[in-house]
């Protein structure tokens, strides 16, 4: 008995039968996802609160609404995205039809994380279904309440001949990766991303890896400290800091640090009250393993704000660390929690040099009243995404691709980028079976005159020819 193998064979048979290709079928699956979100909103909010202590506001803004927006966008543009894309032609192909056809890969695997267990599961799923693929979904076993809904409720809204949910932990995921897929989409840590990529390489399966890293946040001396504090605190402590694009550390001068600390303290009190543990707006650490890891990081540098913790509640207070050394553990790993180290630099040049000697981050932030400073940080660094004078607001635009570079990942998605990620872009040229005299230039015996004429025909419209 091989239940998993049987499931994968069933899905492949459905794909090869052409079931997922029609626009009507794809639209029906997307509509089902939309109904799932609408009809189970409270159930999803409750599950997110149980798993991560997410407030209704955070759940709606960062999970349900974003997922619903992707569904709506895909439904509105599906037929336009599916259309063949006409391309320029050279003189030799003026009478032919040249286009790019967007084809589904086939059977795709989506492995989702626990920190945004709805958003980071459904947003890639929208792209995979819109592109006409059959999908195996592997939600995180760590966010167990959301996992239960995705396994038991979601399949009621989509065609189960083309969709399956696989449950389990690392062992089951490893078994899943032994099978051949046509595309793998993974969101998680760089360590596990390497395991996924190694497994995919055995079958030459293409992958998207949405990983993480240490996202820098540079703060210029000319900034208003309260404005910076408001924006940095909001996106550092959102979801208790368990966000892959959250700022992982602040780079600023000692003078700015002195102005920024009281502003951050004021903001944290305004956001979460005198007792943040009792605030309904502050999440909790997902499990004891992550809690213990984060509590150990509180010993790095010096605690300037916060630092309290409660193991029984998996609570870590919004914390700011100062006097942090570059080689301390808090600066050697992605924090993924409500802890914000401040690292002092003496100049913009030093900040840029500090950023560039580390792995390329998933996101990079620069605060300055000078647009030239922001543009200089943008120009002289590299990251998956960039935002000037705010936090992860670039994530709210489906018109911008989301993805990493280097150690923070490969590939991109959101909006049409998701559709393109899950589509094979097939180069197509349809020629006439007649008019053979027009092809005589390319046949032997060749001559200098024929060569000149052929090159002219091939180079028209700026095209070139590559023969492998």
Swiss-Prot record:
Known function: Oxidizes medium and long chain saturated and unsaturated fatty aldehydes generated in the plasma membrane into non-toxic fatty acids. May have a protective role against the cytotoxicity induced by lipid peroxidation. Short-chain fatty aldehydes are not good substrates. Can use both NADP(+) and NAD(+) as electron acceptor in vitro, however in vivo preference will depend on their tissue levels. Low activity towards acetaldehyde and 3,4-dihydroxyphenylacetaldehyde. Able to metabolize aromatic aldehydes such as benzaldehyde to their acid form.
- PTMs? Dually lipidated in the C-terminus; prenylation occurs prior to, and is a prerequisite for palmitoylation. It is also required for activity towards long-chain substrates.
User: What is the official name of this protein in its record?
Assistant: Aldehyde dehydrogenase family 3 member B1
Per the record, the domain of life is: Eukaryota
* Residues with lipidation of kind S-palmitoyl cysteine: 463
Segments forming a coiled coil: none
Pfam families in the cross-refs? Aldedh (PF00171)
- Give the pathway annotation: Alcohol metabolism; ethanol degradation; acetate from ethanol: step 2/2
Which residues, in ranges, are excised as the propeptide?
A: 466-468
Care to name a GO molecular-function term for this sequence? aldehyde dehydrogenase [NAD(P)+] activity
This protein's membrane topology, according to the annotation, is: Lipid-anchor
Q: Which residues bind NAD(+)?
A: 188-193
Would I find Metal-binding among this entry's keywords? no
Q: Does the keyword Lipoprotein apply?
A: yes
GO biological process terms, alphabetically, are: alcohol metabolic process; aldehyde catabolic process; aldehyde metabolic process; cellular response to oxidative stress; ethanol catabolic process; lipid metabolic process; response to oxidative stress; sphingolipid catabolic process
The active site of this protein is located at: 210, 244
Localisation per UniProt entry: Cell membrane
Locate the Cysteine methyl ester modifications and list their residues: 465
- Which reactions are catalysed by this chain? an aldehyde + NADP(+) + H2O = a carboxylate + NADPH + 2 H(+); an aldehyde + NAD(+) + H2O = a carboxylate + NADH + 2 H(+); a long-chain fatty aldehyde + NAD(+) + H2O = a long-chain fatty acid + NADH + 2 H(+); a medium-chain fatty aldehyde + NAD(+) + H2O = a medium-chain fatty acid + NADH + 2 H(+)
This chain's source organism reads Homo sapiens
What are the EC numbers?
Answer: 1.2.1.28, 1.2.1.5, 1.2.1.7, 1.2.1.48
């Amino acid at each position: 008995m091989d239940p998993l193998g049987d499931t994968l064979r069933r899905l492949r048979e459905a794909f090869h039968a052409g079931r997922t290709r029609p626009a009507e079928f794809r639209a029906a699956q997307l509509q089902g996802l939309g109904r799932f979100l609408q009809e189970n909103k409270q159930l999803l909010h409750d599950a997110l609160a149980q798993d991560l202590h997410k407030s209704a506001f955070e759940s709606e803004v960062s999970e349900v609404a974003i997922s619903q927006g992707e569904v709506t966008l895909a439904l509105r543009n599906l037929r336009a995205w599916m259309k063949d894309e006409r391309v320029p032609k050279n003189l030799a192909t003026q009478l032919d039809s040249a286009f790019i056809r967007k084809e589904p890969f086939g059977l795709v695997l989506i492995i989702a994380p626990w920190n945004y267990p709805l958003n980071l599961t459904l947003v890639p799923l929208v792209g995979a279904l819109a592109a006409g693929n059959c999908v195996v979904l592997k939600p995180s076993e760590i966010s167990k309440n959301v996992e239960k809904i995705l396994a038991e409720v979601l399949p009621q809204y989509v065609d189960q001949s083309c969709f399956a949910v696989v449950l389990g932990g690392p062992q089951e995921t490893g078994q899943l990766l032994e099978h051949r897929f046509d595309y793998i989409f993974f969101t998680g840590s760089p360590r596990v991303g390497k395991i996924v990529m190694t497994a995919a390489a055995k079958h030459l399966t293409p992958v998207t890896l949405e990983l993480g890293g240490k996202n820098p946040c540079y703060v210029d001396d000319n900034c208003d400290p309260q404005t910076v504090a408001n924006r940095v605190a909001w996106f550092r402590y959102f979801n208790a800091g368990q966000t892959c694009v959250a700022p992982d550390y602040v780079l600023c001068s000692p003078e700015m640090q002195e102005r920024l600390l009281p502003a951050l303290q004021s903001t944290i009190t305004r956001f979460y009250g005198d007792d943040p543990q009792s605030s309904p707006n502050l999440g909790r650490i997902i499990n004891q393993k992550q809690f213990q890891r984060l509590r150990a990081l509180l010993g790095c540098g010096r605690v300037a704000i916060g630092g309290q913790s409660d193991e029984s509640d998996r609570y870590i207070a919004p914390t700011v660390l100062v006097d942090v050394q570059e080689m301390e553990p808090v600066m050697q790993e992605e924090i993924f929690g409500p802890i914000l180290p401040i690292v002092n630099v003496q100049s913009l040049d030093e900040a840029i040099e500090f950023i560039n000697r580390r792995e390329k981050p998933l996101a990079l932030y620069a605060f300055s009243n000078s647009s030239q400073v922001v543009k200089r940080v943008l120009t002289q660094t590299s990251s998956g995404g960039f935002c000037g004078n705010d936090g992860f607001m670039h994530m709210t635009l489906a018109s911008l691709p989301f993805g990493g570079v280097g150690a923070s990942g490969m590939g991109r998605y959101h909006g049409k980028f998701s559709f393109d990620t899950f589509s094979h872009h097939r180069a197509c040229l349809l020629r006439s079976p007649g008019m053979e005299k027009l092809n005589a230039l390319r046949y032997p015996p060749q001559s200098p005159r024929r060569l000149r004429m052929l090159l002219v025909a091939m180079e028209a419209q700026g095209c070139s020819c590559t023969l492998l």
